[in-house]
């Protein structure tokens, strides 16, 4: 017989048999080796075929092992040959293939030949219950009336079980999540499926709106007999395109597999509905030069109604791939799946609540569900409901479960800090100077304090963890019982159903109630101590997840933050002197937004700061960023003098398609995408090209901006500050006049420079006063304090006398240039002389650097601290 006429599976089995014989030092390959190889390969299908023929497969393997041990062994001879008995069986296999009209010899015919074999392999199968007629019937059933005409003839059998996932079976087992709502879409899908031709719906919607869930809902309705008569008993099979493509090395293999799937579907007489997720991947799948792709192979079956198909894809991909192929598009009927509103999302989350509680072993409260829907809708703008809301619930549950299973976050932070200090202690121990010794004492003291705190927390944690036991296992048992009850109800076995419903289920629910109350009592008994383990997901936990994901502080304000907001003016006045109106207006805007009273569709605040140079416009913006985020890093500063040309607008929002830099994104839009909660400073705004203001219109009004790539960037959580020197000559000339009078004059000047629609969208135009002599002294004190902080890092202290302070303020005061000359005065009169004295060794660690004004000059006299 010709070995090249064996199927790939049979060739593989013979090669495995040869390896098995060589490993066991058998000189000849016998039928029992081939039988062992066939049963050892899960992809061969031999085991399932024998089981279908009534053979007790579990009795075959031990008998094969025993027969292999009884074969003669030859040491040192690697030349393994085909035995006479195997040759005889292969000849009979060849004759059987010829009788059946097969071009290639398949492995199941080898099993058929073994039925008449007098050797060990035939005896083992007959003892396990093999009958030739039963095996022939099983082979005919598997082949489905087809001959083996190719080397891959065996591989493409039972293609549906290999390349699809049965969603109706998963629904029967209770493995699918419940589908809430979407009744109109499911009804429309059923309606299309009942058509005579072109009965193929395609679900089109944005990612995460629930397209796959609609198909799962259909599968659940079929299982529960909640569908029209024509759909009852049908199966919904999800096509696994990755499995179809994987391992198809040569041209034609993928097409053979897909053809086998289509053939089995045609033979099932419409009993199967195929679901193709990401339908656009079929258009072009397996495409090679001169070959058909999967989409073209599906067209005839779709048009004739042989293939019941449900597709799912996004709007963009449908337009890009499916609409281009008009012949494929006309075979599908569109079902548009929109994004559910917040109320519908809350209903969906309530339906999924029990599943997520069971998975994470925590309790999800109703306020958490409402918060997940509302906060995700407001703050996560680049994704869609209900997916983004489900993600919040899932992540909050995972976070609390992680705290229960591992160390609580507060203990973990303490542990890491202790390790860090221990490493630092070992490094400092090697040094002998005074500074290192002092640092070592500080480290030892802090370590002792942290270790005590850690030990206290550890005691509380162990006690709480001991209390939180048992509820998870009981909940899982209740879930299993409910799934079993649903299956019994479908089968009509009401006696067993009643036994579970009125016996086992109430008992489990009573146990769960007792375990919950014990857990609550454990948490309440130590009310004086902090509770480490949380077992509930509440609105606060959802807000924490949103805050971490977006950087936006949406969590409920703690008392400390409330007090901080009420004293906001005091904080800003520490850095900005003499601008009471500006500080008050900015503080009011921030308080409105944090209290939840501001318009949620606009930025927190948009201000135009006007005034002469050096009066604190930019400094107030820096102070605001420092107040909100404890860091000036969250200030996005854009110098508008860089945008003087018309084409420079593209730098703000990104270049349009076809231009260089399209992939890079815009300077402003990318910065806000990364830090959605920030202060945006547009410095010297009057120097920008007028077209730049057209871009800012939608930012100021709607809190959104579309970048060059078509993505919407959310500005609703930003504070926008624009600074300008316009009208500064009026402000200086009208010094001392009422604020409203000055503002009126400056407003007239603004109207000549900016368009009305731009000015109309700004929340407040803030006029900064020119600085006076008493303001300069306060600013000098702030500047000298910063210099003192820099000296403290070198273990020196700055001491400036009142006379020196007054002289610095006098020499640094210039009504035209504001506070900037003061900085230069401090540099020249204080910093330069002190720098020389430090380098000369006059001042060193633990010294006081005194600054005094005597006899018309600054004096620096060294004294020990």
Curated annotation (Swiss-Prot):
Gene3D superfamilies: 1.10.8.60, Clp, N-terminal domain (1.10.1780.10), P-loop containing nucleotide triphosphate hydrolases (3.40.50.300)
Binding site for ATP 2: 611-618
Coiled coil: 390-524
GO cellular component: cytoplasm
PROSITE patterns, A to Z: CLP_R (PS51903), CLPAB_1 (PS00870), CLPAB_2 (PS00871)
Region Repeat 2: start-end pairs: 82-145
Renumbered residue ranges of the record's region Linker: 340-551
Region annotated C-terminal, chain positions: 771-865
A Pfam family assignment: AAA_2
Region annotated NBD1, chain positions: 158-339
Chain spans, region Repeat 1: 6-71
Segments of this protein annotated with the region NBD2: 561-770
TM segment ranges: none
PANTHER family: ATP-DEPENDENT CLP PROTEASE, HEAT SHOCK PROTEIN 104
NCBIfam families the UniProt entry points to: chaperone_ClpB (TIGR03346)
Function noted in UniProt: Part of a stress-induced multi-chaperone system, it is involved in the recovery of the cell from heat-induced damage, in cooperation with DnaK, DnaJ and GrpE. Acts before DnaK, in the processing of protein aggregates. Protein binding stimulates the ATPase activity; ATP hydrolysis unfolds the denatured protein aggregates, which probably helps expose new hydrophobic binding sites on the surface of ClpB-bound aggregates, contributing to the solubilization and refolding of denatured protein aggregates by DnaK.
Protein name in UniProt: Chaperone protein ClpB
């Amino acid at each position: 017989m010709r070995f090249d006429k064996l199927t790939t599976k049979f060739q593989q089995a013979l090669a495995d048999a040869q390896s098995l014989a060589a490993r066991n030092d058998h000189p000849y390959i016998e039928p029992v080796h081939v039988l062992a190889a066939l049963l050892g390969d899960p992809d061969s299908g031999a085991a399932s075929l024998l089981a279908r023929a009534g053979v007790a497969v579990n009795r075959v393997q031990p008998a094969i092992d025993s027969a292999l041990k009884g074969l003669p062994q030859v040491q040192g001879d690697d030349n393994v040959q085909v035995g006479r008995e195997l040759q005889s069986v292969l000849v009979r296999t060849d004759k059987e293939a010829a009788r059946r009209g097969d071009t290639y010899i398949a492995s199941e015919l080898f099993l058929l030949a073994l039925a008449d074999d007098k050797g060990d392999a035939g005896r083992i199968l007959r003892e396990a219950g093999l009958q030739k007629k039963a095996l022939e019937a099983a082979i005919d059933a598997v082949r489905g009336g087809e001959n083996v005409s190719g080397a891959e003839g065996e591989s493409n059998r039972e293609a549906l079980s290999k390349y699809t996932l049965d969603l109706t079976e998963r629904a029967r087992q209770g493995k699918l999540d419940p589908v809430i709502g979407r009744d109109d879409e499911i009804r429309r899908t059923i309606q299309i499926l009942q058509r005579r031709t072109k009965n193929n719906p395609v679900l089109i919607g944005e990612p995460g709106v629930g397209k796959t869930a609609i198909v799962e809902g259909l599968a659940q309705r079929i299982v529960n007999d909640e569908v029209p008569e024509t759909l009852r008993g049908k199966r919904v099979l999800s096509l696994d395109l990755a499995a179809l493509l994987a391992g198809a090395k040569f041209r034609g293999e993928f097409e053979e597999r897909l053809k086998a799937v289509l053939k089995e579907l045609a033979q099932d007489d419409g009993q199967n509905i195929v679901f193709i997720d990401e339908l656009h991947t079929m258009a072009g799948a397996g495409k090679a030069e001169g070959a058909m792709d999967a989409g073209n192979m599906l067209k005839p079956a779709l048009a004739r109604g042989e293939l019941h198909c449900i597709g799912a894809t996004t709007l963009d991909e449908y337009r890009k791939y499916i609409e281009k192929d008009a012949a494929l598009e006309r075979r599908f009927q569109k079902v548009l799946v929109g994004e559910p509103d917040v109320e519908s999302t809350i209903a969906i989350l309530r339906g999924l609540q029990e599943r997520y509680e069971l998975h994470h072993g925590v309790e999800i409260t109703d306020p958490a569900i409402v918060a997940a829907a509302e906060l995700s809708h407001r703050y996560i703008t680049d994704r869609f409901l209900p997916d983004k809301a489900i993600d919040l619930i899932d992540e909050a549950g995972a976070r609390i479960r992680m705290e229960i299973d591992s160390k609580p976050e507060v203990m973990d932070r303490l542990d890491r800090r202790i390790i860090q200090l221990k490493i630092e202690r070992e490094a400092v121990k090697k040094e002998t100077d005074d500074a290192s010794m002092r640092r070592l004492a500080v480290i030892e003291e802090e370590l002792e304090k942290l270790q005590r705190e850690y030990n206290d927390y550890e005691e509380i944690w162990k006690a709480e963890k001991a209390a939180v036991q048992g509820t998870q296992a009981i909940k899982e048992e209740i879930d299993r019982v409910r799934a079993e009850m649903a299956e019994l109800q479908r089968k009509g076995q009401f006696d067993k159903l009643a036994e579970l419903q009125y016996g086992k289920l109430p008992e489990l629910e009573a146990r769960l109630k007792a375990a919950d109350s014990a857990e609550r009592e454990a948490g309440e008994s130590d009310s004086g101590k902090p509770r480490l383990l949380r077992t509930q997901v509440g609105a606060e936990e959802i807000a924490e997840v949103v805050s971490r994901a977006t950087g936006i502080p949406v969590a409920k304000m703690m008392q400390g933050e409330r007090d901080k907001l009420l004293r906001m003016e005091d904080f800003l006045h520490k850095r900005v002197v003499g601008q009471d109106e500006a500080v008050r207006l900015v503080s009011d805007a921030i308080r409105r937004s944090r209290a939840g009273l501001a318009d949620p569709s606009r930025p927190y605040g948009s201000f135009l700061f006007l005034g002469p140079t050096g009066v604190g416009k930019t400094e107030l913006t820096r102070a605001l960023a420092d107040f909100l985020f404890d860091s000036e890093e969250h200030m996005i500063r854009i110098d508008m003098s860089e945008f003087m040309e018309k084409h420079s607008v593209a730098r703000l929002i990104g270049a349009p398609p076809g231009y260089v830099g399209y992939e890079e994104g815009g300077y402003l839009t990318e910065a806000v995408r990364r830090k959605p909660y920030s202060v945006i400073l547009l410095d010297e705004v009057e120097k920008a090209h007028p077209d730049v203001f057209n871009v800012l219109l939608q930012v100021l009004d709607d809190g959104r901006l579309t970048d060059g790539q078509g993505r919407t960037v959310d500005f609703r959580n930003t504070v926008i500050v624009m600074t300008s020197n316009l009208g500064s000559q009026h402000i200086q000339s009208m010094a001392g006049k009422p604020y409203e009078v000055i503002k009126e004059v400056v407003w007239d000047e603004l109207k000549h420079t900016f368009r009305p629609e731009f000015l109309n969208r700004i929340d407040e135009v803030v006029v900064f006063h020119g600085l006076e002599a008493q303001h300069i002294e306060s600013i000098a004190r702030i500047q000298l304090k910063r210099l003192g902080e820099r000296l403290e890092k070198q273990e020196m202290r700055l001491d400036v006398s009142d006379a020196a302070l007054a002289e610095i303020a006098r020499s640094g005061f210039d009504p035209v240039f504001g506070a900037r000359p003061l900085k230069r005065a401090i540099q020249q009169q204080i910093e330069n002389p002190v720098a020389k004295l430090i380098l000369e060794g006059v001042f060193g660690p633990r010294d006081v650097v005194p600054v005094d004004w005597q006899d018309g000059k600054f004096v620096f006299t060294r004294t020990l601290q």
